[in-house]
């Protein structure tokens, strides 16, 4: 498996969460093929005699239904490696799937935070809470220390609606939390159909492997920026897109480190699959920061005519420059 294949596998490892919330239950009426249903016994961990982490079944179904789109840009062997890394990350059977699992664990450590004072007993009791709970505004988690050493928290909760990312304020600005802002299978199904419609447009495109990776990155950003990654918290504030992006970044670092220093990893085969751990005092991750000097002069050295438009254009250019640097590195 190549580094590029591992990247796409890790980036798309949780696409099944999106698909599952738009579909029925595993043992109910759904869009799953018989092949995907049978695969559940192999790729899902077992909990109290039942398969858990069932979203991986829908991850497999996503690839199965859309394989012809992928095969326009990559070979069958490449697609097979990508699918394996994504689908087996909860019960890995090789080092690459175990790397995705480890990256998923590390990235998930950023998801498990509590919002504090806000509770919704109905969501606590709902078996469909993973379909109902919306992505929360992270600013509501702020606790401001007062002069008497007490902490002030947000007076109300705000959440994001399930809408494609756009420049319209009503799509991207949070709304006050209420029964009207809860999500549902119907809302997810509509959102999923819009995502698939955009994905199918790739059938008319022609680009290389890198072009496919970048296109899928921005396509998932458009549709999963507003989807909560982890729904066991009452008020999750990490999106599925951010979790997928961080998982892919960590997985690539672990893959590179494993290629250079395999002796730093401990492997173990258990009933839960092929598991991998790092030795203590081993640091495979490096965070890179970029500083574009002189940006204030660049930003504000503009004429007064159409100043707002020029300022937005230059700000966008700087943002895309940083993104291009990140992609290149």
Task: Label every PLM stretch briefly.
Residues 158-236:
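Extended, charge-enriched "interface" segments that sit outside catalytic cores
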Residues 296-310, 316-319, 323:
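Extended catalytic cores and adjacent scaffolds of nucleotide/polyanion-binding enzymes
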Residues 282-285:
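A short, charged/proline- and glycine-enriched loop
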